[in-house]
């Protein structure tokens, strides 16, 4: 089941949920954002009414994260095999955040990427493959996901590793320019809906304590 087993939910005590809520859901940790034809004063009053009962500060202090490698396998009676390979990434305030985003786009961001061309188009080993870069306050994950069949997984994993290793040798100017253009286009497309705009504003305020101009983001990508 997508949401977990009933036995897991039954094993969670009510007090545990309440303590988690008190620790994580506080006024200092929440950003409420809106985009579009919004009356600011009305919006502020609605937000205050909805969240006025929250405590000002949370009571939980998160421990710093430490990356550690490992391997996890889960056997199921399925025809498909899902493979995820993760490496230590970087925090969202790291100066290399945008270069990492460009690198992820080059490696596995779409049909023109290295992973798609080599592993799906040329070798036909997967039905889906892409890279991802997830950044957090004090670290991150850079990885690759692939969906394949049981008979292909043994050949697939070494090829995935090889494509990641190739990033350390050389990157052509043409594919670098293509990755930058693709990432810039995707970034600009987030401005086309009010939902995406409000989500972006909230995320930037929570991370950087300011709204980052789109021109600044594009400049970092370039």
Region spans (language model):
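Charge-rich, well-structured scaffold segments of protease-associated domains
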Residues: 1-58, 62, 73-74, 78, ...
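His/Glu-based metal-binding/catalytic segments typifying zinc-dependent metallopeptidases
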Residues: 59-114
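Generic alpha-helical structural context detector
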Residues: 104-108, 117, 162, 203
